Amino acid sequence: MDAKRLTHLQQLEAESIHIIREVAAEFDNPVMMYSIGKDSSVMLHLARKAFYPGKIPFPLLHVDTDWKFKEMIEFRDKTAEKYGFDLLVHKNPEGLEMGINPFVHGSSKHTDIMKTQGLKQALNKYGFDAAFGGARRDEEKSRAKERVYSFRDKNHTWDPKNQRPELWNTYNGQVNKGESIRVFPLSNWTELDIWQYIYLENIEIVPLYLSEKRPVVERDGMLIMVDDERLKLEEGEEIQHKDIRFRTLGCYPLTGAVESKANTLPEIIEEMLVATSSERQGRAIDHDSSGSMELKKRQGYF
């Protein structure tokens, strides 16, 4: 097909499918990270397209912190059963034994132990040499400077000053034993692109992205949804019921909702057309300290 005749979304789709197929052909043991969010749902859809009518030739991995929204876990299990892909779920056993949680230990320690260390454990356990992630360059400044093929050393760390050149659609996947590549097929997509593609392709998403009246508390400048009994009210707090939705999904105590009436995909797209901030402003882990996301990525975070 003539690239000049492709629409913007068709070009993005073709680029992403090309990257997914390249990794499947080039690496011995790839895996696709599955965080259950909108970007993961798009990436899963692209992987299914890339190998249709065959099955996805690599497993999907979810690093579970034990603090995800209940609706996310329900959606994860339902999706895995529906499409029949190989789903691996890993929880950091040491973190669970220590009782690590975001309320007692804070977002930074919780994220490091349950997410970063948990991810590195899983990658080492299964010996994956390439891992797909759904990060996009428009999300956050440290992600904006990361390559599509992001080299990681034997400790899974990232050095932004030691990245490989990428000329057009040519990628260097050469690694030594123990080294790996993080691969970001959605690098050139924007949040608006994601939502338009979800709408056009009729991709299923977690209902939390759609507005509904939900119980929340206002804490540290964020609207935190009361998802289970583990959220204890602090002095002066009270549960309110507001029309909210989420632009990004993570551990529920660390993910802020936005007040919104948008409960259909066209309404979400209308909101995105006038949005002036990144969806990651609702993630507490991005505000631990100046440059906190880049520091986390250097340590092995996605």
Curated annotation (Swiss-Prot):
| Swiss-Prot/TrEMBL catalytic activity | sulfate + ATP + H(+) = adenosine 5'-phosphosulfate + diphosphate
Q: How does it assemble?
A: Heterodimer composed of CysD, the smaller subunit, and CysN.
Quote the EC number: 2.7.7.4
Q: Where is the composition biased (Basic and acidic residues)?
A: 280-302
Family under the similarity heading: Belongs to the PAPS reductase family. CysD subfamily.
Protein name (record): Sulfate adenylyltransferase subunit 2
What processes does the entry annotate via GO biological process terms?
Answer: hydrogen sulfide biosynthetic process; sulfate assimilation
The record's region (Disordered) falls at 279-302
